[in-house]
């Protein structure tokens, strides 16, 4: 049934200097020898968002691995919001990739998947043979018209006594979620004490000049100017031509030139909810062509 995320959730431990080993939940589906696609979640969600896409990709002949970030989904939660930083998320995700022996995968980088994954791809390109970018950027702390909107959204979200998860996703889709789907997004967070990870994400995003992640992200952006591996952007059509669109990525990254980029109609920010079939088709075609 569509509501079932997966029959085979798995956990590995990533090291942390302060808290010791932390359990990181992930899904691993498809034949072990099949071409690998790494699927990354975003703000407000966990790997449940891939419940429709994973079966389509595995049916098309791919292996899919989808991790929950520390603080999200079925992964361990830290006690305080301040326990998370952008760099720690980078380190945890790199540890996951190393332990899973990820090499030459297709990075399917959605929202925070791109914020973290583009940095990692620039620093250690051996993880990825190609990239699919969805409603994402590499934030470097430089001014952008979209940042003011984000700051206002962040202030509004953090002021809420109950930090929304399922409802956050529901406001970012064109096809409304069912009550059961909203409840599934909320399920890993029995009360507000479990939401330190989601609450911290908007605060640590490197959109300000004084963010400690800015120097490393700027260096990564410079490295991406030399990235020749194939890069495909699949964004919500409403983002095309705006500060949240893919144009800067396409212009900056050599591997993005000449690819079949698309703006998907009738999709919201949580594009994976709205367009799983089209995303599976376009991703399959991209892998076949590259």
What are these regions (language model features)?
Residues 47-50, 62:
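Membrane-embedded alpha-helices of multi-pass transport/permease systems
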Residues 18-22, 34:
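Short acidic/polar mixed-charge low-complexity motifs
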Residues 52-56:
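Typically the conserved alpha-helix immediately C-terminal to a functionally engaged Cys/Sec
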Residues 267-280:
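Catalytic histidine-centered segment of alpha/beta-hydrolase-like enzymes
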Residues 1-16, 24, 29, 43, ...:
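Flexible "cap/lid" subdomain of the alpha/beta-hydrolase fold that forms the substrate-access gate
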Residues 34-41:
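Short beta-strand element of the alpha/beta-hydrolase
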Residues 57-78:
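Conserved alpha/beta-hydrolase
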């Amino acid at each position: 049934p569509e509501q079932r995320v997966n029959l085979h959730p798995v956990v590995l431990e990533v090291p942390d200097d302060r808290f010791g080993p932390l359990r990181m939940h992930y899904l691993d589906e498809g034949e072990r020898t099949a071409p690998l696609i790494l699927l990354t979640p975003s703000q407000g969600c966990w790997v449940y968002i891939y419940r429709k896409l994973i079966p389509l990709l595995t049916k098309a002949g791919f292996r899919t691995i989808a991790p929950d970030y520390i603080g999200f989904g079925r992964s361990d939660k830290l006690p305080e919001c301040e326990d998370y930083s952008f760099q720690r998320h980078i380190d945890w995700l790199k540890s996951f990739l190393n332990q899973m022996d990820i090499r030459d995968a297709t990075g399917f980088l959605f929202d925070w998947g791109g914020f973290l994954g583009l940095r990692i791809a620039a620093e250690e390109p051996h993880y990825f043979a190609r990239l699919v970018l969805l409603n994402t950027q590499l934030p470097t702390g430089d001014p952008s018209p979209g940042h003011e909107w984000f700051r206002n959204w962040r202030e509004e979200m953090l002021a809420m006594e109950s930090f929304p998860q399922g409802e956050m996703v529901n406001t970012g889709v064109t096809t409304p979620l069912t009550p059961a789907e909203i409840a599934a997004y909320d399920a890993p967070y029995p009360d507000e004490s479990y939401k330190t990870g989601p609450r911290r994400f908007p605060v640590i995003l490197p959109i300000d000049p004084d963010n400690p992640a800015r120097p490393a992200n700027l260096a990564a952006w410079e490295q991406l100017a030399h990235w020749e591996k194939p890069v495909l952007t699949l964004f919500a059509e409403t983002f095309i031509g705006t500060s949240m669109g893919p144009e800067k990525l396409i212009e900056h990254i050599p591997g993005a030139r000449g690819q079949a980029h698309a703006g998907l109609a009738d999709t919201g920010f949580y594009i994976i909810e709205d367009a799983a079939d089209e995303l599976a088709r376009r991703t399959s075609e991209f892998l076949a062509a590259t």
